[in-house]
Swiss-Prot record:
Quaternary context: Interacts with CDC42 (in GTP-bound form). Interacts weakly with RAC1 and not at all with RHOA.
Taxonomic path: Eukaryota, Metazoa, Chordata, Craniata, Vertebrata
Residues recorded with modification Phosphoserine: 43, 52
Domain note: The CRIB domain mediates interaction with CDC42.
Official protein name in the record: CDC42 small effector protein 2
Keyword Membrane among UniProt keywords: yes
GO biological process: phagocytosis; regulation of cell shape; regulation of Rho protein signal transduction
Family under the similarity heading: Belongs to the CDC42SE/SPEC family.
Gene label: CDC42SE2
MF GO annotations: signaling adaptor activity; small GTPase binding
InterPro entries per UniProt: CRIB_dom (IPR000095), CRIB_dom_sf (IPR036936), SPEC (IPR039056)
Keyword Ribosomal protein annotated: no
Domain CRIB: 29-42
Length: 84
């Protein structure tokens, strides 16, 4: 027995092409507006423990502009990635 395929073009909608994201180059990016430098934070500051993290948060909040945040309890597990 053979198969017979009949295609109805009127019933099949053409699939929309995915939109390509516009490529951004450096000339499209302007200078920051309303920028306020509040703190220096390095990877060593975060790995020294939770006391350091809370002191960094307190320092940044004392500079202003962080009043709209919400408090959250966070537990972090530190993993040493040094090759030994």
């Amino acid at each position: 027995m053979s198969e017979f395929w009949l295609c109805f073009n009127c019933c099949i909608a053409e699939q929309p092409q995915p939109k390509r994201r516009r490529r951004i180059d450096r000339s499209m990016i302007g200078e920051p507006t309303n920028f306020v430098h509040t703190a220096h934070v390095g990877s060593g500051d975060l790995f020294s423990g939770m006391n350091s993290v809370s002191s960094i948060q307190n320092q940044m909040q004392s500079k202003g502009g962080y009043g709209g945040g919400m408090a959250a309890n966070v537990q972090m597990q530190l993993v040493d990635t040094k090759a030994g």
